[in-house]
Amino acid sequence: MTMGNTQNWRLEGDYFEGCNCDSICPCIFLQDPDKGHCNVVVGWHIEKGHYDSIQLEGLNVVAVFVAPGNMFTGPKMKAAFYIDKRSSEEQVNALSKIFSGQSGGFFAAAANLIGEALGIKTAPITFEMKGRRRRLRIPEFMELEIEAIKGNNTDIDSLVTNPSFTVAPGYDPIIARSSKNTYRDLGFEWDSSGKNGFYSKFKYGP
């Protein structure tokens, strides 16, 4: 089934990410990654969402970005997306339109940073939140676990305020560190455990 693009869509929920940079990742200030490259895994859990009349609540999406250098000045990134296997065909098509940037909004701007799209596939995605911990898993492909870094006052989240770029515009990312960050698919393989992580709420629209 195919569908046209629409400007009538909204997504909101929770997101988190992990990469191979040390905390904190300099990429959010448009700087070069501290290892010369940045491999990023990003997960979203949609609490509320729709694409026209197609409801998207409760679904998960994962993106993998491989940046061989500064992701803003080039060379451009490679990107792959995984959509929740529980999604119907209509939901897969809707989420593909949104996350590929075809329906405008944040992802349309982010698409300018991508030089090669490695595809979109469905997969069973586990997205878990417990306090200041987050866990993301796709069997056989990837696993990411992060926990917020504690500051002097452990009752307050440690934030990056006023970043130049964030996956969730309008929200200051909470600084975290991964206890596990492994990936193996599409010819890539890495273990970036013990490195940078961020998480926050998100809200997107056209």
PLM regions: where:
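Basic/polar N-terminal segments that are highly enriched at the extreme N-terminus
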Residues: 1-8, 204-206
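N-terminal ordered "arm"
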Residues: 4-51
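Residues in flexible loops and secondary-structure boundaries
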Residues: 19, 24-29, 35, 52-54, ...
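Short, surface-exposed loop and linker segments with low hydrophobicity and enrichment for Pro/Ser/Thr
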Residues: 30-37, 70-75, 118-137, 174-178
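Aromatic- and glycine-enriched beta-alpha-beta binding-site module
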Residues: 36-107
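Low-complexity, flexible helical/coil segments
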Residues: 53-60, 81, 115-121, 163-164, ...
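Charged linear interaction tracts used for macromolecular binding and regulation
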Residues: 77-159
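Extended, charged low-complexity segments
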Residues: 149-206
